[in-house]
Amino acid sequence: MTTLTNLLDLDPAQLIAYCGELGEKPFRAKQLQRWIHQFGASDFDAMTDLAKSLRDKLATRAIIAAPAVISDHTSADGTRKWLVDVGQGNAVETVFIPEENRGTLCISTQAGCAVNCRFCSTGKQGFNRNLSVGEVIGQLWMAEFELRRTKGIEPGPKGERQITNVVMMGMGEPLLNYEPTVTALKLMLDDNAYGLSRRRVTLSTSGVVPMIDKLSQDCAVALAVSLHASNDALRDGLVPLNKKYPLVELMAACKRYLEFAPRDFVTFEYCMLDGVNDSDQHARELIALVRQADVPCKFNLIPFNPFPESGLTRSHNPRIKAFAQVLMDAGIVTTVRKTRGDDIDAACGQLAGEVQDRTRVQDRMKKMAEYQEKFGKNFGRIVEISS
């Protein structure tokens, strides 16, 4: 049986090479890429400006398949969360956050996470596997065209774009799944695909120093760093990766990255934990840390979203405001992240949700297989959004 090539796995250069293997010229790859990423098409017969001979070849050798949607929930504040099947009993979550002038999609890069930050529920489920390119970019593909379909907006460049910003802040550490992550980033930025600005795509890392340097050369998008502590002793306990890449190395990597970044600052994410990292002294240590390293930055303070296994609690709002004020008085731009989607477990640090209960996921997948056997393989799947 011939293995079908998932065209969502291919970046622009790879798609040109693939078309070359089929005896086609490079311009066919560009046409194909537009159909896939600008029109959301998965049916080759719908790609009417492709030669029929090419469509026939593709129908027997290729497929366009994003992860199937297991569940779809919308929060009272408009935040929308999809649980998607990435196979072998694994599922990841994708979250859309609508705002007045933009729509941000938070995507996952791994099923589970090996970093195991103390305050993050995703890490508590352990690491299962890396996602493929198609599973990463497929989250954007699925979400963009599902949002358009929901609102009755036509596919293609003329239709109003629903996702204007992408943040790699979902499940997993992006820089520990480097090649698929970078390939997906390149597709996001390509004008023949999604055409997003580098300033509107943010990768968040817990601090994999060598890969930060590599990213600066391969695909320098906006950088966010999960900092969460003002000194090594504290960060060792909250972010175990710090034992391998301590703060002095991380700060130096951030400074090097800014030579190539689309923004002139790094965003430091800081989860506010009551009695752990939220004192004025911690804030003063942060000021000294970034000044000594000479890293232009802004801080995004994140109210902790509690979960039972953490043993941690959220800092009180007055404490968060006081902490922010210390930073701002030192001239550091500081924001406090709004808590969005917490009623559907879509808020920051909560992306384990239904995935954490592996038995329930297996039950849902078994039930889905039964329905597909009865009603056809496409039951419950978003397979064609171009019509």
From Swiss-Prot:
[4Fe-4S] cluster binds at C113, C117, C120. Binds 1 [4Fe-4S] cluster. The cluster is coordinated with 3 cysteines and an exchangeable S-adenosyl-L-methionine. Gene3D superfamilies: 1.10.150.530, Aldolase class I. Signal peptide: none annotated. Residues 99-343 form the Radical SAM core domain. Keywords: 4Fe-4S, Cytoplasm, Disulfide bond, Iron, Iron-sulfur, Metal-binding, Methyltransferase, rRNA processing, S-adenosyl-L-methionine, Transferase, tRNA processing. Its main location: cytoplasm. Its cofactor is [4Fe-4S] cluster. InterPro entries: Aldolase_TIM (IPR013785), Methyltransferase_A (IPR040072), RlmN_N (IPR048641), RNA_MTrfase_RlmN (IPR027492), rRNA_lsu_MTrfase_RlmN/Cfr (IPR004383), rSAM (IPR007197). One of its GO terms (cellular component) is cytoplasm. The active site is at E93 (proton acceptor), C348 (s-methylcysteine intermediate). Belongs to the radical SAM superfamily. RlmN family. Specifically methylates position 2 of adenine 2503 in 23S rRNA and position 2 of adenine 37 in tRNAs. m2A2503 modification seems to play a crucial role in the proofreading step occurring at the peptidyl transferase center and thus would serve to optimize ribosomal fidelity. Reaction proceeds by a ping-pong mechanism involving intermediate methylation of a conserved cysteine residue. This is Dual-specificity RNA methyltransferase RlmN. It comes from Janthinobacterium sp. (strain Marseille) (Minibacterium massiliensis). The lineage of its organism: Bacteria, Pseudomonadati, Pseudomonadota, Betaproteobacteria, Burkholderiales.
